[in-house]
Amino acid sequence: MVNRPARIYREWKGPAYTRREYIKGVPDPKIQQFDMGNPAGDFDVEVSLVARERAQVTHNALEAARVAANRYLTKTVGRQNYHLKIRVYPHHVLRENPLATGAGADRVQEGMRLAFGKPIGTAARVREGQRVVTVRIDPENFEHAKEALRRAGMKFPFPFTIVVDKGEELVQD
């Protein structure tokens, strides 16, 4: 099935649909790794990407953000000099009512009859003010952390800000 634009899934509609034990055929989320770099490292600065409005983030967007931020940090500061953490998990199951197109579609298609939809993916529900991605890093690499979070934020369907959670006195903006 084709990946549809994120704007289709961005809005919260109704309660979260998460009970996988009752849902058949939920595809696994594309994002499997949530900690990158050096999780055991001792870093003085912690920077986070914060959502400015509530939204749903698809598992594809989370994976794209992870790859973008991790690749940038690995190339610029090295794998042992940071810890990148994705702080949300795609629990919410997305559904789609498949509509047939092309010749003879009217004979095959059900239309809005039995329109509940089949599971097509998962999404994380993000609240306003929630931290989505966090980078722990040394003060000399602070600008690289900000750029990595900016690149990750471009993959999300909501406006964001980058805030310093720890070590604000060590970095001068």
Curated annotation (Swiss-Prot):
This protein's UniProt keywords: Ribonucleoprotein, Ribosomal protein
GO molecular function, one term: structural constituent of ribosome
Gene Ontology annotations for the cellular component aspect, listed alphabetically: ribonucleoprotein complex; ribosome
CDD domains the UniProt entry points to: Ribosomal_L16_L10e (cd01433)
Family matches, as PROSITE patterns: RIBOSOMAL_L10E
SUPFAM superfamilies: Ribosomal protein L16p/L10e
UniProt cross-references to Gene3D superfamilies, sorted A to Z: Ribosomal protein L10e/L16 (3.90.1170.10)
Cleavable signal peptide: none
GO biological process: translation
Pfam families with a match to the protein in the record: Ribosomal_L16
Cited NCBIfam families: PRK04199.1-1, PRK04199.1-4, uL16_euk_arch
Family note: Belongs to the universal ribosomal protein uL16 family.
Protein name: Large ribosomal subunit protein uL16
Protein source organism: Methanopyrus kandleri (strain AV19 / DSM 6324 / JCM 9639 / NBRC 100938)
